[in-house]
From Swiss-Prot:
InterPro entries: GH5_C, Glyco_hydro_5, Glyco_hydro_5_CS, Glyco_hydro_b, Glycoside_hydrolase_SF, Glycosphingolipid_Hydrolases. This is Endoglycoceramidase. Glycans are attached at residues 72, 108, 205, 307, 409, 485. Belongs to the glycosyl hydrolase 5 (cellulase A) family. It comes from Cyanea nozakii. Keywords: Carbohydrate metabolism, Cellulose degradation, Glycoprotein, Glycosidase, Hydrolase, Nematocyst, Polysaccharide degradation, Secreted, Signal.
Length: 503
């Protein structure tokens, strides 16, 4: 486990962030796409880009964080400065269906403007945004959240939560089950109710035009963000369920629902998005139990869109069970589909020794496979207390301060941009040693690589740098980044190495 600093140091660090006003950069000004041959995210200069980030998801009204001040409801410029200081250069921001389309066909343009404001401000701090249509078990009708009532069609399955229990009584004022009844089961169990399964199937089947409405939501969203280069992509849906597993039990077989239900639906949404936005990447996700391989045979839209497609995946234990094996499976998915990959959720806020061990092991595995990640969750925004699909609380304690355990272990030394093809990188959380190696490529139009490092936390006694080839590589420190420049005279295929060692 990484060595810890006194909590007073943590609080002083937060205080300094809140008052100092970190320099603003334009790192989020370059459009991100995918190199299908390497399956790496790249910017418009041809540099490979790597992201560490967090989730900012508000699952209840008003479906967005407050944009002013600093408290448990905010994601303001104060919060953005904190993330920038920690080296977190991306957020997964809830772009919520009930927030934007509260009633069918009626779009809340005020909501869109607030999300646009958050995206624009975050970009000033070098933070890219993934827009995520987040949901957990679809609806408050099923004790959780995600879809407005108009988008939930259970057909004849009105016996929720059967087969977990007999039908719950409904609150006549809200039309939803009572919270005390919902609390009888873990929220994830409600996916496997007959009513929720039927509602997902009706959504995929375009019953009552619901798939068309989903596509319209994304078309309108893409129209609003097509010119925002700091949008890293559109995530079509969070943790989609398989569909009606009671009518078709084979949907429970890993990969089957991806092929039968999700892939056709994603193609419909892709087509709608591409009528207004040909640039941004689409993030697509399989069911949560794709243990052996995702069931997709192609990316949404087909092979021509491999360079704008990213397979989004999560890792939690349970339901996942073997980190090394399942990452190998995901990497094989990326090689097969020739698309990018992104771990868009992992637990970064757990309190147990196992939570900590799992998180640190996942970070190391992500480095090994050159994968970007986003932790769950920056702030709870009330979702834990409201039984809205949160496994645990957030990066913040009840007073609004960043928790010591989070600060120590999510701010890691890593490359944010590499001017070539990355061979590998590694951060040793005990010794703080960091190594990076990459190959100069002919198609990269930049010689500048960027490494984030938290000097105050990890290198407070100073550091030493070693580069190779010595006569062709220079470096300089700019705040909490090291800028590495290699000579334009280096030929393609030349290996460049960089090492950072704490004194």
């Amino acid at each position: 486990m990484a060595e810890t600093q006194p909590l007073v140091f943590v609080l002083m660090s937060i205080s300094a962030i809140l008052t100092a006003g970190l320099p603003i950069n334009d790192d989020a000004s370059l459009l991100i796409s995918v190199n299908p041959e390497t399956q790496q995210l790249v910017d418009s200069l041809g540099r490979e880009r790597f992201f560490h980030g967090t989730n900012v998801v508000v699952k209840h009204k008003p479906y967005h964080p407050s944009v002013e001040g600093y408290d448990n409801t905010s994601f303001s410029e104060v919060d953005m400065k904190i993330l920038q200081d920690l080296g977190l250069n991306t957020i997964r921001l809830g772009m919520m269906l009930p927030g934007y389309v509260p009633t069918r066909g009626n779009y809340n343009e005020t909501y869109l403007k607030i999300i646009q404001e958050i995206v624009s401000k975050a970009a000033k701090y070098g933070i890219y945004t993934l827009l995520d249509m987040h949901q957990d078990v679809m609806s408050a009708k099923f004790c959780v959240e995600g879809f407005p009532d108009w988008a939930v069609n259970t057909g004849n399955a009105d016996n929720f939560p059967f087969p977990l229990e007999d039908k719950y009584p409904l609150n006549l004022q809200t039309g939803y089950p009572y919270p005390k009844d919902c609390a009888k089961h873990a929220w994830g169990d409600y996916y496997f109710t007959e009513a929720a399964a039927a509602a997902f199937q009706n959504f995929y089947n375009n019953t009552d035009g619901l798939l068309d409405a989903w596509a319209d939501f994304w078309k309108k969203t893409a129209q609003g963000f097509k010119d925002y280069k700091s949008v890293i992509g559109y995530e079509l849906i969070n943790e989609p369920f398989a569909g009606d597993i009671y009518r078709d039990p084979s949907l429970m077989i890993p990969g089957v629902a991806d092929e039968r239900n999700l892939a056709p639906a994603y193609d419909v949404i892709h087509k709608a998005i591409r009528t207004v936005d040909e640039q941004h990447s689409i993030f697509f996700e399989g069911v949560t139990w794709d243990y052996f391989a995702a069931g997709f045979s192609k990316v949404p839209g087909g092979d021509a869109y491999r360079n704008r497609s990213v397979l989004s995946y999560h890792y939690y234990e349970p339901p996942d069970f073997n980190k090394k094996f399942q990452f190998e499976v995901r990497m094989e998915d990326l090689r097969r589909l020739k698309c990018g990959g992104f771990l868009t959720e992992l637990l970064t806020v757990g309190d147990t020794a196992k939570d900590m061990s799992d998180m640190l092991e996942l970070f190391d595995i992500c480095d090994q496979h050159k994968q970007s990640w986003m932790g769950w969750l920056y702030k709870s925004y009330g979702c834990y207390k409201q039984h809205l699909g949160c496994l645990t609380d957030s990066m913040h304690d009840e007073t609004g301060h960043l928790r010591d355990i989070v600060l120590q272990n999510t701010t890691r030394t890593y490359p944010q941009a590499v001017a070539g093809h990355t061979i590998g990188y590694k951060f040793d959380r005990i010794t703080k040693k960091f190594d990076l190696s990459f190959v100069v490529t002919a198609d990269c139009r930049s010689t500048e690589s960027i490494v984030y490092f938290n000097k105050d936390l990890h290198y407070s006694n100073g550091y030493d740098v070693t580069v190779f080839p010595k006569d062709s590589v220079t470096w300089k420190q700019v705040e909490k980044k090291i800028i590495i420049n290699h000579s334009q005279k280096l030929s393609a295929g030349t290996t460049v190495t960089f090492s950072l060692v704490a004194k």
